[in-house]
From Swiss-Prot:
Organism in which the protein naturally occurs: Yersinia pseudotuberculosis serotype O:1b (strain IP 31758)
Family per similarity comment: Belongs to the membrane fusion protein (MFP) (TC 8.A.1) family.
Matches recorded under InterPro entries: CusB_D23 (IPR032317), Multidrug-R_MdtA (IPR022824), RND_pump_MFP (IPR006143)
Name this protein carries in UniProt: Multidrug resistance protein MdtA
Superkingdom to which the source organism belongs: Bacteria
Length: 444
């Protein structure tokens, strides 16, 4: 009995201890959470009081960047993909047969018209020339003798010592000898020409390519294998295509240039369309449209003194066909695309925004021409557009590149103040930091 009562008392003690621990834990959680809740409620009440006292005065305005629409002279360009071609290309071959004795050029070098390129063995043609000269000397002697005989026959015919037939025969012999002499002279000229052809010279100025035949090979005239190819790259041409719908603008640009004795400018840009390589002028237009592609070919010429254009190089050709006067221009980022069409956000004197539908014209990556819907001098929003609504007041901020980059310390201070005054923006973004604009290209 005693042992059983001891066990019972121990059990009561153990259970009592567990209950006490549970009560202590629950009490701590209850009173601790209540304190936190009270503190949080007090803070929220304080914030509510601050907001009620301050009203809208503490609500920050949406930051935007703005630009002013200006009037400018804007050139109108037409752009097409083109290929650089040599102004002239010559395939150099031999006009005579013989062994190739020497090459007098270095592959890739610039040569001038008349420079010696190669030599064919001249000895066979020297022999032919000597033979022709010898035959000429022989026939010339025969002619001289025939002429002397004719002079004697003419004297004798006057005295009647020879017949008229003998006189006529001698006259024919003289003419025959004269013909032989002329033929011999032609043979000499031909031999000299063949001898000249054994020295192959550059027919045009330009850059020689890789040699197609080595010294020591026997060359036959008229063979399909050339010795070398010369391309004229000073100047050089670019052939490019444009849609047939652009033909009227091109023709009008040509007529305007002819009236002022000017040229139609053409620019050659690299394939990424980021760097201009050369400036030239429109040389010619093809006389027919390609029915397969609906395009027309144009050829432009460039001096290419710095050799930036190379044959068969792909370029973007831009031809200037017009110059717009007093065109209203805004940054490209200001123009947005909506369900009703293109529009811009304008700013009044109170920095309140308003949506204006516009008609756009010529544009590039930097600016766009507004044909209708906007006047020069009006301010338009270029950044922070995604948070705008009709009639809302905004804060126009200076672009970061013009402000913070010049004074990093001031920028950091302003950012810290902005973060402290507007904690609800989150992610550490300053209140006056310009919002990223959504361009028409990104929306599409």
């Amino acid at each position: 009995m005693k042992s059983q009562s001891k066990r019972t008392s121990r059990l009561f003690v153990f259970v009592g201890g567990v209950v006490a621990i549970i009560i202590a834990v629950l009490s701590w959680r209850y009173f601790g959470t209540g304190s936190d809740n009270n503190t949080s409620g007090a803070q929220q009440s304080a914030r509510g009081q601050d907001t009620s006292h301050g009203g809208r005065r503490n609500t920050p305005l949406a930051p935007v960047q703005a630009a002013t629409a200006t009037e400018q002279e804007v050139p109108r360009y037409l752009t097409g993909l083109g290929t650089v071609i040599a102004a002239n290309t010559v395939t150099v071959t031999s006009r005579v047969d013989g062994e190739l004795m020497a090459l007098h050029f270095t592959e890739g070098q610039q040569v001038k018209a008349g420079d010696l390129l190669a030599e064919i063995d001249p000895r066979p043609y020297e022999v032919q020339l000597t033979q022709a000269q010898g035959q000429l000397a022989k026939d010339q002697a025969t002619l001289d003798n025939a002429r002397r005989d004719l002079a004697r026959y003419q004297k004798l015919s006057k005295t009647g010592l020879i017949s008229q037939q003998e006189l006529d025969t001698q006259s024919s012999l003289v003419r025959q000898s004269e013909g032989s002499v002329k033929a011999d002279q032609g043979a000499i000229d031909s031999a000299k020409l063949q001898l000249t052809y054994s020295r192959i010279t550059a027919p045009i100025s330009g850059r020689v390519g890789l040699k197609q035949v080595d010294v020591g090979n026997y060359i036959t005239s008229g063979t399909a294998t050339p010795i070398v190819v010369i391309t004229q790259t000073h100047p050089v041409d670019v052939v490019f295509t444009l849609p047939e719908s652009d033909i009227p603008a091109i023709i009008q640009a040509q007529k305007n240039a002819e009236k002022t004795h000017a040229i139609v400018p053409v620019e050659a840009w690299d394939r990424t369309n980021k760097q201009m390589l050369a400036q030239g002028y429109l040389l010619s237009i093809d006389n027919q449209i390609d029915t397969t592609t609906g395009t027309i070919k144009l050829k432009a010429r460039f001096n290419n003194e710095d050799d930036v254009l190379f044959p068969n190089q792909f370029v973007n050709a831009r031809i200037k066909v017009d110059l717009l006067q007093n065109a209203v221009v805004v940054p490209t980022a200001a123009v947005q695309m909506g369900s009703e069409g293109n529009f811009v956000w304008t700013l009044d004197d109170a920095n309140k925004v308003s949506k204006h539908l516009v008609t756009t014209g010529i544009q590039n990556s930097q600016q766009v021409v507004i044909d209708a819907g906007l006047n020069a001098g009006q301010r338009v929003v270029t950044d922070g557009i995604d948070r705008l609504t009709e009639g809302v007041q905004v804060e126009v901020v200076t672009p970061r590149s013009a402000n913070t980059d010049a004074n990093p310390a001031s920028a950091e201070k302003a950012a810290a103040e902005a973060e402290g005054s507007t904690p609800h923006q989150g992610r550490g973004r300053p209140a006056n930091a310009p919002a990223r604009s959504t361009t028409a290209a990104e929306k599409s």
